[in-house]
C-alpha cells in the first residue's frame, strides 16, 4: 500500500511539472463535475452542466429549494426522480438515491463528507437547509472520487458561495400547519475587496404532528390518538454558521464553523415503556418534549482553499466534526437487565478528522486530469445503559486519478481509478449487569469482542459523453465499494426504536457494486426530455436478515450478505407552451432481487415503489422589475408495493394533490418573497412504504399548509 501511495504522489508531481510548461491557462469548462467552478466561472448552460459528468447529474439552485420547502432538506428535494426522503416524522428525514440510503450514499458540504451517525434510522441529517445555496446530486456509484459510502450516489451541498454585494442579507419566516411549526432564518453577508463573510441563524419549533386517523395498530395493540396527533413528536432545532473567506485572482480560502442542534421526541406509544405504565401525561400538551427523546448536536469546522501554480489548479480541504447524540428513555428492566439508574439510554460521541488534496490540469489541450489524495479518521465512544454498537476507530486513506479526454467539444471519454485502505478497530464491551450462564455463576456477558479489520479496494470507471444538436447521450460503467460499518460488524443488542434484536457479523466482506448507467437528453425552446436508466449488480450486498429466533424476547435479525441485482429508470419531461405555461411529467421505477442466500427471490428491505408526478405550472410577471410569480398544481401517484421482505408489510398505492404558489415583490432596494404550499390538499390517508413509522401503521400527514415569507436586502 505504501508503494502505491508513493507512486500516486510521484504521479501528481510529474503532472504538475508537465502542466507548468504549458503557456495557456486551462479551459475551466474542461474540468470535472465541480459545482464551485460552475458558479464562479458563470458556466451555467444546460449543455455544459450535462457534459461535466458521464453520470446522471442534477443541479438545484436556492430558488427551487425555497419553492418546494418542506420540514427538512431531503423532503424539499424528494420531488427529483431517483431521490427519496426516508421520513422520520414530519420534520426529519434521511436521504436515499435510487433506493440506497444510510451508509450507501454520501452527503458532502462544500466538498467535505458529512459524518454523523448515518446508520441510525431514527434521526435526520444534521444540516441547516436555509444555509444551503445550491445542491448538486450525482445519481449512481461515486466511490471513485468520494470513497466508501458513495456506492449509491452523492448529494453535494454548497453553502460557501461568495456574496455579490458589500452588504446583503435575507430574513425568512416560515410556518407549517401539520405540526404547528414556526421558524425564523436570518442571513447577513458581504464582501470588501477580496474578503467576504456570511452568517446564518435558524430557529425552528414544532408540536406533535397530525395524521389522518384516530388510532393505529402497533403489533396486536390498538392505540387511540388524541386529536389525531402522534404523542411526543414535538421538537426544536437551533442552527448557526459563520463563514469568512478570501477570494483572490490566484488564491482563495474560506473558513466555516457551523453548529446544528436538534431535540425531538420519539412517538411515546412505540418506544420504551408503555404509555399506560408511564407517569408522564403525554396528552397534557402537544408542545412538550418528554421522554423518550433524543438530543443531537453537530459541530463542524472546515477550511477550503484553492490556488494555481502555473497551469495547475490545486484544492485542499481540512475539517473537524463532532457529533454528539444522546437518547433518553424512562428506565425499565428488560430480560436480565435490572432497572437502570437513570434516563440516559445511549450516548454517542463521534469525532471525525478529514484532510484532502486535489489537483486539476489540462494536458496537451485535450486531457483534463483530476487527481488527489485524502485521509479520514473517525473516533466513536458510547455510554448509557443500552447497547447496540461498540466503541470504534476507523482510519481510511486513498488516492484517485480521473481523466477526461476531449476528442472534440461534443465527444468526451472519461476514465478513472481509485485505491483505498480502511482500518477499523472495534473495542470489547461487557454488560453492566450479570446474566446467568448454565453450569456456572452469573457473568458480565461480552456483547462485542475486540476486533481489527483491514480492507483494501481498487475501483474504476469508464464513461462517455456525446452531444449532437439538441441531443446529449451519456454512458458510464464502473465498480464501487463500501466497507462494512462497525454496526454491521459488531452490533449485539436490542434496538428499542423498532423492537428487534440486532446481531453483527465480524467476518463480513467489503460490499462491491458493478453498475452501468445510460442517459438520453433532448432540448429545444419548448421541450426538455431527460431519461436515465441503470443496472446494478452486487456480488455481496450487506443487509439485516430477519430470523424466526428470539433473543431476550425479541425477534433476532443478523447481518449477512447475498448477491443482488437492481435496475431502474427515471424520466423528467418538461413542455412549455402558451408562453407562460409549463407541463411537467416525472417518474421513476426500481426493481431489486436477491439472487442468493436465505431470502433468494425476495426484493431488498424497504424498496421504494414506482411513482409518477404530473404538474402544471403558470408563471407571471415580466421579471424586469424583479417581480415574478407562479402557480402550480401537482398530482402524485405512487404504486403498490407488494414485493417485500418479511416482516415488512405490503403498502397500497395512493394519489395526492399538491398546490403551490409564489410571488416576488420589489420593495425599495429589496425583494419581498411569498411562497404558499398546500400538500395533500384532499386529506388522503396513505402510507409511505419507506417511512420510519410504516411498520406500526402510522399514515403520512394529512392536509398540510405551509407559508414562507422572505425579505432579501
Question: Where are these predicted regions, by residue range?
Answer:
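Outer membrane beta-barrel strand-and-loop segments of large Gram-negative receptors
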Residues: 232, 342-358, 503-510, 515-516, ...
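C-terminal beta-signal and adjacent terminal beta-strands/loops
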Residues: 206-212, 537-540, 583, 637-642, ...
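Surface-exposed extracellular loop regions of Gram-negative outer-membrane beta-barrel proteins
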Residues: 377-380, 423-448, 452, 466-516, ...
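Short acidic/polar hinge/loop motifs at secondary-structure boundaries
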Residues: 113-139
Amino acid at each position: 500500500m505504501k508503494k502505491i501511495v508513493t507512486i500516486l504522489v510521484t504521479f501528481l508531481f510529474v503532472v504538475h511539472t508537465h502542466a507548468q510548461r504549458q503557456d495557456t491557462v486551462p479551459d475551466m469548462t474542461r474540468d470535472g463535475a465541480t459545482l464551485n467552478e460552475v458558479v464562479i466561472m458563470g458556466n451555467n448552460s444546460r449543455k455544459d452542466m450535462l457534459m461535466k459528468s458521464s453520470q446522471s447529474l442534477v443541479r438545484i439552485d436556492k430558488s427551487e429549494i425555497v419553492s418546494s420547502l418542506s420540514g427538512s432538506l431531503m423532503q424539499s428535494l424528494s420531488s427529483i426522480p431517483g431521490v427519496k426522503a426516508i421520513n422520520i416524522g414530519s420534520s426529519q428525514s434521511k436521504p436515499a438515491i435510487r433506493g440506497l440510503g444510510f451508509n450507501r450514499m454520501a452527503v458532502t458540504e462544500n466538498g467535505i463528507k458529512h459524518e454523523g451517525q448515518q446508520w441510525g434510522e431514527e434521526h435526520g441529517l444534521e444540516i441547516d437547509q436555509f444555509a444551503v445555496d445550491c445542491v448538486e446530486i450525482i445519481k449512481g456509484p461515486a466511490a471513485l472520487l468520494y470513497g466508501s459510502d458513495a456506492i449509491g450516489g452523492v448529494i453535494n451541498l454548497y453553502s460557501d458561495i461568495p456574496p455579490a454585494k458589500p452588504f446583503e442579507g435575507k430574513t425568512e419566516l416560515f410556518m407549517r400547519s401539520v405540526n404547528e411549526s414556526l421558524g425564523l432564518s436570518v442571513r447577513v453577508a458581504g464582501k470588501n475587496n477580496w474578503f467576504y463573510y456570511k452568517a446564518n441563524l435558524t430557529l425552528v419549533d414544532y408540536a406533535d404532528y397530525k395524521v389522518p386517523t384516530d388510532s393505529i395498530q402497533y403489533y396486536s395493540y390498538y392505540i387511540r390518538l388524541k386529536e389525531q396527533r402522534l404523542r411526543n413528536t414535538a421538537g426544536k432545532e437551533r442552527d448557526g454558521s459563520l463563514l469568512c473567506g478570501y477570494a483572490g485572482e490566484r488564491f482563495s480560502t474560506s473558513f466555516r464553523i457551523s453548529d446544528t442542534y436538534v431535540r425531538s421526541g420519539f412517538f411515546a406509544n412505540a418506544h420504551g415503556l408503555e404509555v399506560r405504565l408511564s407517569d408522564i401525561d403525554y396528552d397534557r400538551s402537544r408542545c412538550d418534549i418528554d421522554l423518550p427523546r433524543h438530543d443531537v448536536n453537530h459541530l463542524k469546522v472546515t477550511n477550503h482553499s484553492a490556488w494555481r501554480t502555473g497551469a495547475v489548479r490545486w484544492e485542499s480541504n481540512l475539517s473537524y466534526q463532532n457529533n454528539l447524540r444522546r437518547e433518553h428513555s424512562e428506565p425499565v428492566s428488560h430480560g436480565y437487565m435490572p432497572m437502570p439508574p437513570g434516563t440516559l439510554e445511549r450516548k454517542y460521541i463521534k469525532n471525525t478528522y478529514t484532510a484532502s488534496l486535489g489537483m486539476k490540469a489540462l494536458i496537451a489541450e485535450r486531457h483534463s486530469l483530476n487527481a488527489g489524495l485524502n485521509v479520514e479518521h473517525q473516533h466513536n465512544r458510547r455510554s448509557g445503559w443500552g447497547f447496540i454498537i461498540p466503541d470504534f476507530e476507523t482510519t481510511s486513506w486513498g488516492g484517485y486519478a480521473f481523466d477526461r479526454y476531449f476528442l472534440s467539444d461534443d465527444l468526451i471519454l472519461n476514465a478513472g481509478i481509485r485505491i483505498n485502505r480502511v482500518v477499523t478497530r472495534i473495542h470489547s464491551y461487557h454488560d453492566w449487569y450479570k446474566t446467568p450462564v448454565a453450569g456456572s455463576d452469573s457473568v458480565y456477558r461480552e456483547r462485542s469482542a475486540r476486533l481489527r479489520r483491514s480492507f483494501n479496494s481498487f475501483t474504476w470507471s469508464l464513461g462517455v459523453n456525446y452531444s449532437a444538436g439538441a441531443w446529449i447521450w451519456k454512458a458510464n460503467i464502473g465498480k464501487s465499494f463500501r466497507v462494512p460499518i462497525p454496526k454491521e460488524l459488531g452490533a449485539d443488542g436490542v434496538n428499542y426504536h423498532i423492537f428487534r434484536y440486532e446481531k453483527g457479523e465480524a467476518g463480513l466482506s467489503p460490499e462491491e457494486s458493478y453498475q452501468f448507467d445510460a442517459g438520453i437528453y433532448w432540448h429545444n425552446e419548448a421541450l426538455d426530455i431527460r431519461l436515465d436508466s441503470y443496472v446494478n449488480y452486487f456480488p455481496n450486498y450487506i443487509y439485516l436478515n430477519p430470523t424466526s429466533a428470539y433473543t431476550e424476547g425479541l425477534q433476532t435479525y443478523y447481518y449477512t450478505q447475498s448477491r443482488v441485482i437492481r435496475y431502474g429508470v427515471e424520466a423528467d419531461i418538461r413542455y412549455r407552451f402558451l408562453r407562460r405555461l409549463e407541463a411537467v411529467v416525472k417518474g421513476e421505477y426500481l426493481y431489486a432481487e436477491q439472487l442468493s442466500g436465505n431470502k433468494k427471490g425476495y426484493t431488498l428491505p424497504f424498496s421504494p415503489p414506482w411513482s409518477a408526478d404530473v404538474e402544471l405550472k403558470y408563471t407571471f410577471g415580466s421579471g424586469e422589475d424583479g417581480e415574478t410569480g407562479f402557480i402550480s398544481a401537482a398530482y402524485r401517484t405512487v404504486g403498490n408495493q407488494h414485493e417485500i421482505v418479511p416482516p415488512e408489510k405490503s403498502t397500497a398505492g395512493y394519489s395526492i394533490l399538491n398546490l403551490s404558489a409564489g410571488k416576488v415583490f420589489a420593495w425599495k432596494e429589496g425583494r419581498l418573497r411569498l411562497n404558499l404550499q398546500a400538500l395533500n390538499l384532499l386529506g388522503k390517508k396513505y402510507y409511505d412504504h419507506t417511512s420510519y413509522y410504516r411498520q406500526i401503521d402510522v399514515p403520512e400527514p394529512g392536509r398540510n399548509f405551509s407559508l414562507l415569507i422572505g425579505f432579501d436586502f
